[in-house]
Amino acid sequence: SYAAQRIIVTRVLIALNVFVFLWTLVGSGALDQRQFDLGLSLPFIANGEWYRIISSGFLHFGLLHVGMNMLLLWQLGQLLEPVLGEWKFGLLYFASMFGGAAGALLLTPNGLTGGASGAVFGLMAAAAVGLQQRGVNPLRTGIGATLILNLLITFAIPGISIGGHVGGAITGAVVGYAMLEPRWTRTS
């Protein structure tokens, strides 16, 4: 369909995430050196390794981790990218990723964090906000249920980055609100 052809940014993001995941598999051990070199942790940021804010957003610690994030990215990308356009969708994704990184650094500054979950939570929250702005209760849609289920999983399973998920969701909700419902209209 036309909408499926227009999800270029979504496809590129999925390809990058899968590439980085496969690249980290080339190493050995439970936590290989490549994962360690890309992960987010405040001591590394304080040491000037700012690239980790971006690299950690493409790093995944297992097949289930990358698989779930890419499944949600694919579904949310099909919904949001045709509505927002490529540039705004990319901006929403990366703003949410940065929000997730900030949340992770605030709550677990010395932990090693990675994954696209912050960005994906931002996309879920933006979609929920967009539905609400249009008079659709997001809790009566798959988006609302998916967001709630993922938040429950976030708080129920140890080792999941609560700060990353919540930081991404808050950022996505705010940026999504601004993008999906302009508060100012032009008058001539």
Task: Give the role of each language-model region.
Residues 1-188:
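A detector for small-residue-rich transmembrane helices and their helix-helix packing motifs
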